[in-house]
């Protein structure tokens, strides 16, 4: 007997009453429970982008290097000489909060599949992580679990994690963020897409068996958390990186044949989403025969088979007559493989089970016909008072040196060495610079010797405080800082991906934040010539009604040529000249200093002049390529004083356990406003450089040609950071505070009896 569809069942599936009414209108009848489950996942925010799609369409998505823009598993850009890069960033926020190790691990697995589904071999990963207040009882538990999950999966796959960012803020206490980025390399003329083309072609299942893990994961990722969060552990997928490694190699071998017509990762919403999306892109129908799906558990129902999010699975459309070729390659790699369906001309998506049709739905309402909302928007009501706050009324610290030490110990600013030492960043020997700098640089020579002179620069980042205080400007800052980081290693930005993390879009102030951030990213990308080629939206990042800071993470890719001429972020030689490319405004609105020293998150983010920003970047990029610089370091969180301190400290402790290496500096800074504002303000468009004295005149000439201001500050040398008239601190003391920031979080947690306290 068919189970009746009640309002309670509709609500359990995350559908609103008006959405269910639309389903009835599309079908002209009551859906079965299986069909309701299909609509539930396909109309979830995670799959349909129903609240965000109207805004995302405003992004610039085309350009001379774009080979594949948004809408596929990953974006693809042309690197020249017949080579291309596929890349994307994806969130796994909700699963990682519920079960941090598996949530983060399967997030890595999912983004790797997105990239190699395009025909690319993944060569590098990054991540952008957000955790709650360091003193919160759950923060260390999540930090340890997430980092272990990322390292555990990526290390087993043999894909190096070469960079990223980690930040802490109380708004993430109940909702951590795990944004995973992967880039792969492929021939520019061999891109594979997720389309069900060719009526009569077989639909084949490849990979791990299907179990009950992850059922309704997409729906869970489209809802707020509450007191029942711990009960949602069964919706978190379980990953097997060794199975994924076999799947990767099998797919890359299949791509060398003529057997693959289309291929799609079974990610969110599993077999349902992958098959529906392939049918939608191909403009065709699809018949699935669920009896043929390889199962890991007994007694699974069609509903469970279709909605399972078991990992390490692919759906491919093979050329008719090539089934045995696909089968032989997959069996060679010890993978399950089965023909489970056919492409049809019906325009309908059908699922068969034991001789009966258990779902028969038109494809269009599940894809392009899904709801699209123009939700109400209004500025956040707290902003006028925050903008009006008089920063000049704040007291100046009595000891600026002590303030700098405290700032360096803040986990957001502190060394991330504890994190990246758990990642195998040396595997495949692609890294041209070690983790800890402004941008990661990977060589292409390991995979393609003919391209030995080329490298790729990678950067991820965003400042959530800036985006809260001014979403439009904050989002522009995210793009500008990623581009600045790439300029610091001599790279030319070419494209971005994004991961847009926000709270509940049904709240007008959250929807306004989202729309303004999208507008800011779009305008900045147009200015830098960096189209948006892929991305992800993660909404409902709220717990008990408390939302996260708006966090539109940007991941940028740049071309470094020649890769031998890249640059590091730390001072190198005593006697080198230190200079600031940019100006000194002392803008502390939304800064880490304001929060750390005064407990305030107020004011406006620093002004951003895109013409000035581009001039600063062009100056440094050309100087790096000309070999003029010893170091280049972006001034961001913590301002100029933190940038100077970081430049004094090595990012790697010697493996023999000897005293860490560092070098001091002595500088004289003009103070147009209060000293603390100049030292710790996070003014935009600034890069701190060091260079041999003999290169100084050429560098100043270059800056003048590019239209960028340069301020000569002082020289590298000694064992103290000395800022005349402001502070003098031993670099050893700075390094001790900086290196201990994150270990201190873990020690604090160990001191609590309830280290893994429930939510």
From Swiss-Prot:
Any one GO MF annotation of this record: magnesium ion binding
Domain of life: Bacteria
Organism of provenance: Anaeromyxobacter sp. (strain K)
Family of the protein in this entry: Belongs to the FGAMS family.
Name of protein: Phosphoribosylformylglycinamidine synthase subunit PurL
Residues that hold Mg(2+) 1 according to the record: 90, 536
Function: Part of the phosphoribosylformylglycinamidine synthase complex involved in the purines biosynthetic pathway. Catalyzes the ATP-dependent conversion of formylglycinamide ribonucleotide (FGAR) and glutamine to yield formylglycinamidine ribonucleotide (FGAM) and glutamate. The FGAM synthase complex is composed of three subunits. PurQ produces an ammonia molecule by converting glutamine to glutamate. PurL transfers the ammonia molecule to FGAR to form FGAM in an ATP-dependent manner.
Recorded GO CC terms: cytoplasm
Swiss-Prot/TrEMBL keywords: ATP-binding, Cytoplasm, Ligase, Magnesium, Metal-binding, Nucleotide-binding, Purine biosynthesis
Annotated HAMAP family: PurL_2
Catalytic activity, as annotated: N(2)-formyl-N(1)-(5-phospho-beta-D-ribosyl)glycinamide + L-glutamine + ATP + H2O = 2-formamido-N(1)-(5-O-phospho-beta-D-ribosyl)acetamidine + L-glutamate + ADP + phosphate + H(+)
Active site, renumbered: 46, 92
Pathway given in the UniProt record: Purine metabolism; IMP biosynthesis via de novo pathway; 5-amino-1-(5-phospho-D-ribosyl)imidazole from N(2)-formyl-N(1)-(5-phospho-D-ribosyl)glycinamide: step 1/2
Residues the record lists as binding substrate: 91-94, 113, 237, 309-311, 538
EC number: 6.3.5.3
Keyword RNA-binding listed: no
Binding annotation for Mg(2+) 2: 114, 265
Family matches, as Pfam families: AIRS, AIRS_C, FGAR-AT_linker
Residues annotated for ATP binding in this entry: 49, 88, 498, 535
Keyword NADP in annotation: no
Gene Ontology BP annotations: 'de novo' IMP biosynthetic process
Main localization, broad class: cytoplasm
Subcellular location, record wording: Cytoplasm
Enzyme class: ligase
Binding partners and assembly: Monomer. Part of the FGAM synthase complex composed of 1 PurL, 1 PurQ and 2 PurS subunits.
